[in-house]
Amino acid sequence: MHDKKSPMANSHYLKNLKQQFRNKNLIETTIHLVKCNDHDSLAFLARTYGVPPQLRHVVWPILLKYHPMCISPNITSNTISWDPITNDFILNDPFLKSKAPTDKQDKSDDENILPYDIESIILHDLKKYFHSRSNPAGSSSNANTTNIATPTPVSSSDASTISSMEVLSPSLDYEFQIIETLKNAIVKFLLKWSKIFKYENGLAWIALGLAEWYPIYPYETMSPFNETHSFYEVEDYVVLSGRKHALLSTNNGNNGNSNSSSNNTNNNNTNITSGMHNLSINTNTSLHNSPYISHTLSYLYKEYPLPFELRSKLPTKPIFSFSALFERLALVILHCPDTILAHKQLKNDSNASSSSKANSNFNTNYFPIISGGDLSFQTQVFFKVFSSILPELYQPLTEESSLQPSSSRNSWIYWWLKCSGAKALQRQDRGRVWDLLLGWRPKPNMDTINFFLNYNDKKMDHLYHDTPQCDNEQYWMKDWIALYNNDPFWFPDLDSMALGSKKFPYDYSVFKELILRNRYGGTQSKAQKDNTVPSPGSDSNDKSELKLPFSSIDPHMQLIFIFIAILQFNEFKLLEFEEAEISEFLNNVPLLTKFDDSSYRKLYENTESSITSLPSSPTTSTMASLQSSSNSSAHISNYHMLIEVGNDAKASHCFDDLLNMAGDIWRKWLWRELEESSL
């Protein structure tokens, strides 16, 4: 007698099938875009759908190579601050306040050389990652850990997947070399940017977060980086596997498809400290004599399998060394517009205006919610939105002294906002958040670019395109653009406004126009009609109609609303927590994207399933059904903001749900602010 599945079970099963079908098509599309270097389309997929975890080590370097904030960088400074009273900069000493400066340290500052004890502090911070979990009960901390187990031979029948490979633990000496390499990447960044940014422990966790997705070569300092070296030809490349679930993933990551590591290693290796399980290491084992089946990315492909025929299409030459890629990632995460310049421009415009009201209130006009502000402004907006959207949760969180944000770098708000989720978010969630940061792109014209990068003096619009540049773009990109034909943080009429033009040079001028266009609902101005963009999903074969949607607001402002969505997503749970439990949640947010993560882990698990027969392009019927569900959630009513207990969407643990919720919060909150403003 067959068990009869409930409608709910069937619903989840169908959702799983659709998600796996979409993910397989996303992987194939991404590989094709990488091959033809269509970085515009890759950025679009990264900020909307996310980069498949199997491919981040290939896609992230491309995104960072063309990122506007890397081409024209400006980062927040912790060495100087602006004093509005004296209208001048003042020097800060953001670290080592308890240590009296020595002659050696003073001399090193003058010569733009790092203080002598900074490297030891960096090493201390990095080691926290590797030893964040104690040894299992009964294990000896003094055990010999210098032996590395012999890898289990892999048969040719496993060519389609390497999920059965054993992840080996390196020796302590090897771990120290890895830590040294990470430290050197941070030191290189500080040597270049030390006059603007002194070391903070956030840099260590950003480097570690990058190393969880991008391979590092531990002997880079002894053997200089060479772009001719392949990931798959050079031995000893390492990918960190994450500190939170390393032990669990190592032993159980294959759902029973692999033997326990204890069956293949000696007793000495079982006593390796917990940090040792955080590493995957390259060996000489290969399949079909192909470099693409190297153990270089063994942990990554063990956790997120990728068939051989797809791996063989990936480029083999790294674009950047780890230290170079870390610098670019740090430039994006620490990016800050020139707020001093923005205030001066607003003041000059106010002085030139005949309106005395504008002249006296120019400071109130500086509210860069679209173009982005500094960390102080981001923190202000975060708590302003928090108190407005979640008042019942905001009150207890702000009343508890241990939960209040402070200048301490142990504060949860430091990790959330300044470090873009480093340390506080799980590896999978942080990777998806960084996808959004690295995929951020404004419209490809200099007015809009300079609206977000107000300090910029470089011409870069020729690097970007508003149409896909891949071969047979209609074939590859049309359905993806149709699914997300709007930026998640769209706002009515915002996309039709020429940001940065003479008419809309500042955020407040944009706000005035938005109020004018939307205050009397149903009225569409001539300007709106003239700027109406054809639907990307139209049936026309005109190439110009296949337009890529671009980002509407600054990426760090987007993160604010994503974090508010995380709090709203867990509101009922947090209201029941004690103070210590809330603090643990804020500093160590549980995995949010379980559904997405599980889908990618099991993507190629059932080889006999009908969904494993991957078409060359998304089929019309399946993509149409996905488009219907995506559009309905993307354009959900601004007033439908409550979480319903037992809601399927709430239980799905999908980042798309968080992203759509964040967009809803953005629109609801901004319109409320505009209605209450005096613009």
Curated annotation (Swiss-Prot):
Rab-GAP TBC domain mapped to chain residues: 50-441
CC annotations in GO: cytoplasm
Annotated InterPro entries: Rab-GAP-TBC_dom, Rab-GAP_TBC_sf
Transmembrane segments: none
Region annotation (Disordered) ranges: 135-159, 250-270, 524-544
Major localisation: cytoplasm
UniProt keyword annotation of Cytoplasm present: yes
Subcellular location field: Cytoplasm
Gene3D superfamilies reported in the protein's UniProt record: Ypt/Rab-GAP domain of gyp1p, domain 3
Bias type Polar residues, positions: 524-539
Keywords: Cytoplasm
Biased composition (Low complexity): 135-153
Keyword Cytoplasm belongs to the record: yes
Family of the protein in this entry: Belongs to the OCA5 family.
Function: Required for replication of brome mosaic virus (BMV), a positive-strand RNA virus.
Protein name in UniProt: Oxidant-induced cell-cycle arrest protein 5
Gene: OCA5
